[in-house]
């Protein structure tokens, strides 16, 4: 039996108090970070292969169904506001399309050919990377996409919670995050989903840092989409250049990003 389908270590959940349930879930969640830690060498291997491809104009495609697909779309959607990258650089695809973000689409994940068909609509090429996400490691939508991508010489990776899965057989880099049985038997939105989110954070953040989208520890390319972020950017410029608030904010709004504002100011001081 797959680990993700094994019975929970806990039983008679309906007889437990709220406090007991919360403590049980928290106890299980503490296992997730340790499982992710064990997978760091494989995560590193994947990132090290992604970065040179992206420097040549490559993209990352996350592919999943259900919770796994939603998490891929979520991570991809955070890249433009956080790092100021175009939304075409990291793309999340979910079985059933955007409708499936809110509502289950019956049978969508069982279509072995649909995933690759969607990738071809993006004119996928050998500079790109496809990362399959599936706790079970058995999702046909993902497996079919990885298989075809690999045939076309495209880098493939996968994130799964079961060892030696069919999905892993189709990936160049296999990230196995073995978190054990779920608190509610088979509910892989729980520990598996938490671990997937952690790994996706690690992949996208480390890639963006390697691509120069962070300076020091700051999001110097973030989009200025609300007052909070304008103020954060203003503080970054104040700290970096020693300017007062009004001068820093004027520079920021003039140039549109922290990085461009700092670069423009330093250029003006040197010339």
Please describe what each predicted stretch is.
Residues 58, 154, 243:
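Short glycine/serine/threonine/alanine-rich loop segments
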């Amino acid at each position: 039996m797959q680990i993700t389908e094994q019975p929970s270590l806990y039983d008679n959940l309906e007889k437990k108090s709220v406090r007991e349930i919360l403590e049980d879930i928290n106890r299980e969640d503490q296992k997730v970070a340790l499982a992710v830690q064990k997978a760091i060498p494989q995560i590193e291997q994947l990132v090290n292969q992604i970065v040179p491809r992206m420097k040549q104009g490559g993209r990352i495609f996350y592919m999943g169904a259900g919770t796994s697909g939603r998490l891929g779309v979520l991570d991809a959607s955070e890249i433009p506001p956080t790092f100021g990258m175009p939304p075409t650089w990291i793309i999340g695809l979910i079985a059933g399309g955007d409708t499936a973000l809110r509502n289950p689409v019956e049978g969508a994940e069982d279509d072995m050919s649909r995933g690759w068909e969607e990738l071809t609509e993006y004119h996928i090429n050998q500079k790109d990377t496809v990362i399959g996400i599936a706790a079970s490691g058995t999702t046909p939508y993902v497996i079919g996409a990885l298989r075809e991508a690999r045939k076309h010489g495209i880098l493939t990776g996968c994130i799964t919670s079961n060892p030696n899965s069919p999905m892993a057989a189709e990936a160049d880099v296999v990230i196995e995050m073995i978190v054990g049985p779920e608190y509610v038997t088979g509910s892989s939105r729980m520990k598996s989903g938490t671990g997937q989110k952690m790994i996706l954070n690690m992949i996208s953040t480390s890639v963006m840092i390697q691509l120069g989208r962070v300076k020091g520890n700051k999001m110097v390319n973030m989009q200025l989409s609300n007052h909070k972020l304008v103020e954060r950017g203003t503080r970054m410029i104040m700290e970096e250049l020693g300017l007062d608030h009004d001068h820093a904010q004027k520079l920021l709004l003039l140039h549109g990003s922290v990085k461009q504002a700092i670069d423009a100011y330093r250029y003006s001081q040197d010339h």
